[in-house]
Curated annotation (Swiss-Prot):
GO terms for molecular function: copper ion binding; DNA binding; DNA-binding transcription factor activity. Residues 1-69 form the HTH merR-type domain. Its main location: cytoplasm. This is HTH-type transcriptional regulator HmrR. The gene is hmrR. It is found in: Cytoplasm. It comes from Sinorhizobium medicae (strain WSM419).
């Protein structure tokens, strides 16, 4: 099947199929005499695996590892579980960070008058700049702020 057909049956866009081929997630496609890519059922199965892994938020590197484990019939399920547990821990860290940002923004928004005044704790916090968000108490507003 051509790339359009493979895209349709796998649920992966043609652009992403080319990208996955470029970075080595899938094997280079067989080419016709006119240089069109052709894909078989195994390729589509691999693309569906990749799509599902992406849907679960796995990184490209993690997907490479999962694909290697999937292809290894002598794999230990403990290896697969370790990748999944590592990913769960990362997702939980991201959730905690998002919850922290949400709490901070809610607190700042509750202290912004939202009227014609020019002063606003939200703008003042963002104007401080800085690197990664870290929660800290801001004595001026008595709120958690981003540092």
């Amino acid at each position: 099947m051509n790339i359009g057909e493979a895209s349709k049956v796998s649920g992966v866009s043609s652009k992403m199929i080319r990208y996955y081929e470029q970075i080595g997630l899938i094997s280079p496609a067989v080419r016709t005499a006119s240089s069109y890519r052709t894909y078989g059922d195994n390729d589509v199965h691999t693309l569906r695996f990749i799509r599902r892994a992406r849907d679960l938020g796995f990184s490209v590197e993690q997907i490479k590892e999962l694909l290697a484990l999937w292809r290894d019939r002598s794999r230990a399920s403990s290896d697969v579980k370790a990748v999944a547990l590592e990913h769960i821990a990362e997702l939980e860290r991201k959730i905690a960070a998002i919850q922290d940002m949400t709490r901070t923004l809610k607190h700042l928004a509750s202290h912004c008058h939202g009227d014609g005044r020019p002063d606003c704790p939200i703008i003042e916090e963002m104007a401080k700049g800085g690197g990664a968000a870290k929660t800290e108490i801001n004595p001026r507003f008595g709120v958690a702020s981003l540092k």
